[in-house]
Amino acid sequence: MSRKVHCVKLQQEADGLDRPPYPGELGQRIYDNVSKQAWSMWVQQQTMLINEYRLTPADPKARSFLEREMENFFFGQGSAPPPDFSPDHS
């Protein structure tokens, strides 16, 4: 049976993650309050941010930026795409 959480992103009960997806306090907070579906939404958002800003995840500044965006995505005002972002509809 799946673990259920009240997802802060979806504002509904949903299947929870199997384990904390990120180290430390933020990872535990996400594990306790974010659903699998919302985590999948974040992975798509993170991929877009990495591609649009040409980030290297191994770079400490990029990791710090992505961590702030992740916290905003789930617990703040959300994570906005870059100003000139236009999704490819092809």
UniProtKB/Swiss-Prot annotation:
Coiled coil: none annotated. Keywords: Iron. GO terms for cellular component: cytosol. One of its GO terms (molecular function) is iron ion binding. InterPro entries: Fe_traffick_prot_YggX, Fe_traffick_prot_YggX_sf. It comes from the Bacteria. One of its GO terms (biological process) is cellular response to oxidative stress. The keyword Membrane does not apply. Pfam families: Iron_traffic. Could be a mediator in iron transactions between iron acquisition and iron-requiring processes, such as synthesis and/or repair of Fe-S clusters in biosynthetic enzymes. Belongs to the Fe(2+)-trafficking protein family. NCBIfam families: PRK05408.1 (NF003817). PANTHER family: FE(2+)-TRAFFICKING PROTEIN-RELATED. This is Probable Fe(2+)-trafficking protein. It comes from Halorhodospira halophila (strain DSM 244 / SL1).
